[in-house]
A protein has these predicted regions:
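Helix-loop junction within the histidine kinase core
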Residues: 76, 80-91
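Short alpha-helical Gxxx[C/S/T] motif in the catalytic ATP-binding
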Residues: 210, 214
């Protein structure tokens, strides 16, 4: 029975890896085709007769597809580093507000029509600087936000930041949370969320790596990620870590 279970687990892993490879093909081809098509159109005869406003819109689409392609490549490289145990962080003094704003701005083009992207940032933390890996923290928040964008068709996506004191541990804690009004996540699927290659039913975009990478980044930053969700009524992904203002 144990041996059979091992075979089943191996087969399941192989199936997930095959799906992942198919997803890579789609996630690379889609932005590449868009980049080639938009560039040809912009530099062709039609582009020469475009209004400046239309040219700017085209350039914006090119930029968004380039960003999407870069995100895919970064996720693939980070997966490789995770499997080798070589995913690292480099801490510096960074602006907390700047990190949150960069993550929010990076996903604006992915928000579906009818969804409001907003943030709640305490005035008391506006000028806060912390010692952490700003690039990795931004990546974690961006993945949280992208996940919300993929599953929220109406309502809102809200990035919330707060600081509080954990009396039990005697430390000040930073919590950054992304709340959405999407479809929510069934209880039986929640344990799989932070594992590689996992995607929700009906999810068309993404490689299924973002949340797995988030969990690893959180550990390296000395924090944790967790989920609060209702099957009907949206989800809330949060990251918490101890911090001291610089």
């Amino acid at each position: 029975m144990v041996e059979l279970s091992g075979v089943d687990e191996s087969t399941k892993k192989k199936e997930l890896e095959d799906i992942f490879l198919d997803n890579i093909s789609h996630e690379l081809r889609t932005p590449l085709n868009a980049l080639i098509g938009l560039n040809d159109l912009l530099n062709g005869v039609a582009g020469q007769h475009m209004e400046e406003e239309d040219r700017l819109i085209m350039k914006d689409h090119i930029h968004k597809n380039a960003d999407r392609l870069m995100t895919v490549m970064d996720d693939i490289l980070d997966l490789s580093r995770m499997q080798k145990g070589s995913l690292t962080i480099h801490k510096t003094v960074v602006s907390l507000m700047e990190i949150c704003c960069k993550a929010r701005d990076a996903v604006k083009g992915q928000v579906q029509p009818g969804v409001k992207l907003q943030h709640e940032y305490p005035v008391a933390l506006k000028d806060t600087f912390i010692y952490t890996d700003g690039k990795r923290l931004e990546q974690l928040l961006r993945n949280f936000l992208l996940n919300a964008c993929h599953h929220t068709e109406l309502g809102s996506i809200t990035l919330k930041v707060k600081a509080y004191r954990d009396e039990k541990r005697g430390r000040r804690m930073l919590q950054i949370r992304v709340d959405d009004t999407g479809e929510g996540i069934p209880h039986e699927r929640r344990s799989l969320l932070f594992k590689p290659f996992r995607k929700f039913d009906g999810q068309m975009e993404g490689l299924g790596l973002g949340l797995a990478i988030c969990r690893q980044i959180a550990k390296l930053l000395g924090g944790v990620v967790y989920l609060n969700t209702h099957y009907v009524g949206g989800s809330s992904f949060a990251f918490e870590m101890p911090f001291e203002e610089i």
